[in-house]
Amino acid sequence: AMTGSYSCMTLIATLIFDTASIDQKAAWVEQIAKMGEEVIEREQEIADYLACDFNRVTYLGSGSFGGLAQESQLKILELAHGLVATSYDTSMGYRHGPKSFVDDKTLVFVFVNNDEYTRQYDLDILNEIGGDEIAMKTIAVQQDDKTVFGGESFTFKGYNLLPEGYLALPFVLVAQTVSLLNSVRVGNTPDTPS
């Protein structure tokens, strides 16, 4: 399903264009590898998010995570052969019309940014969607547990805060795991994407 290609291309582009030192980049890559292992170890937690009768998934993110939201919704759409409706947007843009996509069969995932200012938009939409009490589940995907949010959260704890480009990789692994598990859930084989 080309998940490895996406991840490798993203990592290579990030490493090429990032102006940080080689040593700093190496430390960040080592950290994202550990975070990736953590996603695999916590697969059941992700499976628990999907243990409900949903038929829609929305991914939201701010800054670089807006593009990550697009890739994430594309992967679930592809691996489910369109059996699950998907949408994506930025955290700020979602409330201006696209939020009408949410119904009581919708899972909403929000990639929470580490930037303090940008993070406010992510938290605002998490709380707004949760407060609407329409979505089946609203799930924050985040690196630390500073999020004040009443919904569910897949949180990477105990790591140094990463820049967006690097944090996108463990975040996308969460989304790829959602896509894989959903593919099996709808009776599709992940090796034959549409």
Annotate each language-model stretch with its function.
Residues 1-194:
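A SIS-like phosphosugar-recognition module
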